[in-house]
Amino acid sequence: MKKGYLITIALLCLIFTSNAQEENTNASNFGLKGGYNLAAVSFDGEEETGQRHSFHVGIYGESFVSKAVALQLELQYSQQGYQVKSNGGTFTQKLDYINIPLLFKMYPEDSFYLEVGPQAGFAISHKETFDSSFNLFDTSQEFEPNKLDWGINFGGGFKTNNGVSLGVRYHLGLGDIYEDQGSPRNRVWQFSIGFDL
């Protein structure tokens, strides 16, 4: 008898879960997001430069494939780069990108999510500034970045029922910023707030 009750309860739970997933399968959100960047560059996968403080802003589309799983595509303008200090002087390179992250999101709880996914970035501008006392390397050399950057994002955050989200993300760059200069790669922390429209 108990076994029959357990089977019945299990079937009801399965049906309820399936219905809940179907209700959320076609759910989608579109919104705006922006926030604060802490950007640096890693050389040879070890030594990391000082951080550049900057920002990012963009749009996103989030589509649920089940109650707890969603895909999110973003189009983002991101100010990145790095700082190097030596002998009282500072060298700063400002690198501006248009980034396109594609994120696999999981919601283990209703308002909490984890995310991971690839990102492609396109360098659109760069600018170098330095003090006259800076002499760690030759500042007259060319600092033209590669047009294409790519890597992986990891992150998490909270999203309320009314569509406001707070998130933290780490971008692990896997493509070299320059050619033949010690494998410099982007390392960026992003702290963002988003709003569904």
In which residue ranges do the predicted regions lie?
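Cleavable N-terminal export/targeting peptides
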Residues: M1-N26
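Outer-membrane beta-barrel strand-turn architecture
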Residues: N24, S63-K67, M106-D110, T160-N162, ...
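Residues that define the transmembrane beta-barrel architecture of outer-membrane proteins
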Residues: N26-S28, T49-F55, K94-I98, L148-I152, ...
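Membrane-embedded beta-strand positions of outer-membrane beta-barrel proteins
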Residues: L32-G34, L73-L75, L102, V116, ...
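Transmembrane beta-strands of outer-membrane beta-barrel pores
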Residues: Y36-A40, Y77-G81, A120-I124, Y170-L174, ...
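Outer-membrane beta-barrel "beta-signal"
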Residues: N37, Y113, G155-S165, R185-L197
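Outer-membrane beta-barrel translocator domains and adjoining extracellular loop/strand segments
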Residues: S42-E48, Q83-T90, K127-F134, Y178-S183
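Repeated loop/turn-to-beta-strand initiation elements of outer-membrane beta-barrel proteins
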Residues: A68-L71, S111-L114, N162-V168
